[in-house]
């Protein structure tokens, strides 16, 4: 474990200060000799920290990819740089190249498999909170062995990982805010104290005795929770108010379930059709099929019937016709053979009398 922790101080870190520097860091002025590669890495960490801290949940896929890339790269670099690979001791550049390639694969897996990405995000949150607890308890507690910090890191990481799988939205927001604030504080620590606070964290994880921190280090350490709180508030009130990646996943799952049900229903219908016995062909000549009714859309309308005045009988004519049939008004019919009291212009009977002609 001490050898693994020593690999954290590779080429990005400046030379380790001596005991006199640890003894009086506030009185002795710092020699700020910046290098190009560490400065570039710290600037990129600051930019990614801003994205993590204030836009973490909105950039959900990007956060999962970067978290997987970070875990894969760090773990593989420590293994390759510390251990012998194929009986060959790899250099720092070769180890960094291998770690970057495997880290890209881990990032893709974390981005595509949502549960893996959430587990890594929660694990990172637990590790950072455990490291913050070690830093905060520095004036009051000194671990006797390395197993105390190691158990705290593993326990906190697994607990936060499981809680993130249970409540993804609030804990992802908290994890991204804390991670982004830690990246910004690390970049500020490099430009202010040449990663003196980072070395202090490593020594605390190794359970090594270290002197108390200077006020500059405590100010940089106080920047971490302050930025974390700001990031949580900004994401809760602004950037994550209308976004919910959980609802998107649930809607996709419902759509898949509906498609599966439709396919199952179609398969059942096909099985029922196959189970039905085929109908026997009818004996004898088959009659030609009857033509079906024409389509109502193409049916011709009937020709409208024209009406004239003589087509409608007057009520007086109908009454006189009834009287003639019963024989009750024979004299009146002979006196006035035509009915002039008409309404629609009928001037004569439309039909002849059914009885024999009467002679007068």
Swiss-Prot record:
UniProt GO BP: positive regulation of canonical Wnt signaling pathway; Wnt signaling pathway
Subcellular location: Membrane; Cell membrane; Cytoplasmic vesicle
Chain spans, region Disordered: 260-302, 316-360
Bilayer disposition of the protein: Multi-pass membrane protein
One Pfam assignment: TM7S3_TM198
Extent of Pro residues compositional bias: 279-296
Biased composition (Polar residues): 326-339
Keyword set, alphabetical order: Cell membrane, Cytoplasmic vesicle, Developmental protein, Membrane, Transmembrane, Transmembrane helix, Wnt signaling pathway
This protein's GO CC annotations: cytoplasmic vesicle; plasma membrane
Presence of keyword Transmembrane: yes
Transmembrane region(s): 36-56, 59-79, 93-113, 116-136, 145-165, 177-197, 218-238
Family classification: Belongs to the TMEM198 family.
Function: Promotes LRP6 phosphorylation by casein kinases and thereby plays a role in Wnt signaling. May be a membrane scaffold protein involved in the self-aggregation of LRP6 to further enhance its activity.
PANTHER family xrefs: TRANSMEMBRANE PROTEIN 198 (PTHR31247:SF7), TRANSMEMBRANE PROTEIN 198 FAMILY MEMBER (PTHR31247)
Subunit structure: Interacts with LRP6.
Protein's recorded name: Transmembrane protein 198
Protein encoded by which gene: Tmem198
């Amino acid at each position: 474990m001490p050898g693994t922790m020593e690999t954290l101080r590779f080429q990005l870190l400046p030379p380790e200060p001596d005991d006199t520097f640890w003894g009086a860091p506030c009185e002795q002025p710092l020699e700020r000799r910046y290098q190009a590669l560490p400065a570039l890495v710290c600037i990129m960490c600051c930019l990614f920290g801003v994205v993590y801290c204030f836009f973490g949940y909105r950039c959900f896929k990007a956060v999962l990819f970067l978290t997987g890339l970070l875990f894969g790269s760090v773990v593989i670099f420590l293994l390759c740089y510390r251990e012998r690979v194929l009986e060959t001791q790899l250099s720092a550049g070769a180890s960094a190249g291998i770690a970057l390639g495997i880290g890209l694969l881990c990032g893709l897996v974390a981005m595509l498999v949502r549960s893996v990405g959430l587990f890594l995000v929660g694990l990172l949150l637990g590790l950072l909170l455990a490291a913050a607890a070690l830093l905060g308890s520095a004036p009051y507690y000194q671990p006797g062995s390395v197993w105390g910090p190691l158990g705290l890191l593993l326990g906190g990481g697994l607990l936060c990982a499981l809680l993130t799988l249970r409540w993804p939205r609030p804990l992802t927001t908290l994890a991204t805010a804390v991670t982004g604030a830690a990246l910004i504080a690390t970049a500020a620590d490099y430009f202010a104290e040449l990663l003196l606070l980072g070395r202090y964290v490593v020594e605390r994880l190794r359970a090594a005795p270290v002197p108390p921190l200077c006020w500059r280090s405590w100010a940089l350490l106080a920047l971490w929770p302050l930025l974390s709180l700001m990031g949580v508030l900004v994401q809760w009130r602004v950037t994550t108010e209308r976004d919910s990646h959980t609802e998107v996943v649930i809607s996709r799952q419902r759509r898949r379930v509906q498609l599966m049900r439709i396919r199952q229903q179609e398969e059942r219908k096909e099985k029922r059709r196959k189970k039905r016995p085929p109908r026997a062909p009818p004996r004898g000549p088959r009659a030609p099929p009857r033509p079906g009714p024409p389509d109502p859309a193409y049916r011709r309308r009937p020709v409208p019937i024209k009406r004239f005045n003589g087509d409608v009988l007057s009520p007086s004519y109908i009454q006189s016709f009834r009287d003639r049939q019963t024989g009750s008004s024979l004299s009146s019919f002979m006196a006035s053979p035509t009915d002039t009291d008409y309404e629609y212009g009928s001037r004569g009977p439309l039909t002849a009398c059914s009885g024999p002609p009467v002679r007068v």
